[in-house]
């Protein structure tokens, strides 16, 4: 069952500069495992040392957030798209930029 894993721009340097990869996988966890096996540098950006998906990494299957499904055990089927969306934080408060 090939599923497509979309790799976001900030993580592409750790995935051979690819924007996506396809794998045969029955679950989200299996697909992410195959992704990090192929691109070992990517693993530390997606997972903690304990092997848990990092809290700022959001994963979707066909626009459905896996946190509200079966998490990494969420089943996948042929043609599904898995999107990895890292949360972005930072910037300055408006007062620091001269605003109010």
Please place each PLM-identified region on the residue numbering:
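Ubiquitin-like/PB1-type beta-grasp interaction modules and other compact soluble beta-rich domains
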Residues: 1-100
């Amino acid at each position: 069952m090939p599923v497509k894993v979309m790799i976001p721009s900030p993580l592409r340097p750790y995935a051979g500069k690819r924007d996506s990869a396809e794998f045969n996988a029955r679950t989200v966890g299996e697909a992410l495992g195959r992704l990090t096996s192929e691109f070992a540098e990517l693993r530390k950006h997606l997972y903690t040392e304990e092997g848990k998906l990092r809290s700022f990494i959001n994963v979707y299957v066909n626009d459905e957030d896996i946190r509200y499904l079966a998490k990494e055990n969420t089943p996948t089927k042929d043609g599904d798209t898995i999107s990895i969306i890292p949360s972005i934080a930072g910037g300055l408060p408006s007062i620091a930029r001269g605003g109010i």
